From Swiss-Prot:
Source lineage: Eukaryota, Metazoa, Chordata, Craniata, Vertebrata
Subcellular location, record wording: Nucleus; Cytoplasm; Cell membrane
Identification of the protein by name: Ubiquitin carboxyl-terminal hydrolase 12
Chain positions covered by the region annotation Disordered: 146-168
Activity modulation comment: Activated by interaction with WDR20, WDR48 and DMWD through different allosteric mechanisms.
A single GO cellular-component term on record: nucleus
An MF annotation (GO) of this entry: cysteine-type deubiquitinase activity
Species for this entry: Rattus norvegicus (Rat)
């Protein structure tokens, strides 16, 4: 059995080497971006959900730059962030241009910190993205708090942040955080009340044969609060019918959009996949911004897509397609291939609902031009 495993691993390594060599030739020495590296990630038993998100984040340049800058800081105790920084640094400093890296240290730490990921079952890529970004933000805030307590902040001995105040935003927030405003208008007195809510990614409902722009408009559709759902108006001092809608008040540097492709079916007692065809353009402008939004005409470029292949949340596979400089790459665990921009259309989804098994965009990463 052990000999068979060794032979299998050797064959896999040979395949990886051949794939890497082919990729380097296809891009060509003159076109290959300076100081760029394209490395696949070894799958440690259904860790494609993790590999695909890590590849997408690596090619979100503002995020990559911050993680690499963190690596250059004085050594800290091991955390998920230090393991991520080590992985990104390992990719960025390879002598070879293309190849394969085992993210073993990161996976080991992830499984140690969160029992949800401590098994060999398929996990949800969006849940992992959410967990990773929030964990990194928590680590950075805790480190800043410790620095303040130790009196190492440059702004002197004055601690402007008491225990009950909101922590300062981290670079995770600076890159991914946007703000939604929830507007409610009383239909009796016309008073508008609004409540702001921060987000690191937006989850949007999907419909058949639509676009991501349509999904975002649906996200901001006006909802009527009536009957038992009436709104308590402070001005009227009673429950009234009202209109409620959600709009984007602050656009993030990188807009992460999660397409809600998994729906719980009561008759089946399980989640099933909505393989609907949802077009996501290479360029995006949001039209559901609030009146007081800063830079409402901000343009975004698609930089990465996490794709779900299969028929359900706990079955199937995840891959990533990313834009690097002027071309697109597909990362399928340890395999890396160059693809045409037109090939992205293959990941929109299916026009027919008959076949649920599909390769469809699940998390989209759009980067602001400014």
């Amino acid at each position: 059995m052990e000999i068979l495993m060794t032979v299998s691993k050797f064959a896999s390594i040979c395949t990886m080497g051949a794939n890497a060599s082919a990729l380097e030739k296809e891009i060509g020495p003159e076109q290959f971006p300076v100081n760029e590296h394209y490395f696949g990630l070894v799958n440690f038993g259904n860790t494609c959900y993790c590999n695909s998100v890590l590849q997408a984040l690596y090619f979100c340049r503002p995020f990559r730059d911050k993680v690499l800058a963190y690596k250059s800081q004085p050594r800290k105790k091991e955390s998920l962030l230090t393991c991520l920084a080590d992985l990104f640094h390992s990719i960025a400093t390879q002598k070879k241009k293309v190849g394969v890296i085992p993210p073993k240290k990161f996976i080991t730490r992830l499984r140690k910190e969160n029992e949800l990921f401590d098994n060999y079952m398929q996990q949800d890529a969006h849940e992992f993205l959410n967990y990773l970004l929030n964990t990194i933000a928590d680590i950075l805030q805790e480190e800043r708090k410790q620095e303040k307590q130790n009196g190492r902040l440059r702004n002197g001995d004055v601690d402007s942040e008491d225990n009950n105040s909101t922590p300062d935003p981290t670079w995770v927030h600076e890159i991914f955080q946007g703000t939604l405003t929830n507007e409610t208008r009383c239909l009796t007195c016309e008073t508008i009340s609004s409540k702001d809510e921060d987000f690191l990614d937006l989850s949007v409902d999907v419909e058949q044969n639509t676009s991501i722009t349509h999904c975002l408009r649906g996200f901001s559709n006006t909802e009527t609060l009536c009957s038992e759902y009436k709104y308590y108006c402070e001005e009227c001092r009673s429950k009234q019918e009202a209109h409620k809608r959600m709009k984007v008040k602050k656009l993030p540097m990188i807009l992460a959009l999660h397409l809600k492709r998994f729906k719980y079916m009561d008759q089946l007692h399980r989640y099933t996949k909505l393989s609907y065809r949802v077009v996501f353009p290479l360029e995006l402008r949001l039209f559901n911004t609030s009146g007081d939004a800063t830079n409402p005409d901000r343009m975004y470029d698609l930089v990465a897509v996490v794709v779900h292949c299969g028929s359900g949340p706990n079955r199937g596979h995840y891959i990533a397609i990313v834009k690097s400089h002027d071309f697109w790459l597909l990362f399928d665990d340890d395999i890396v291939e160059k693809i045409d921009a037109q090939a992205i259309e293959e990941f929109y989804g299916l026009t027919s609902d008959i076949s649920k098994n599909s390769e469809s965009g699940y998390i989209l990463f759009y980067q602001s031009r400014d």
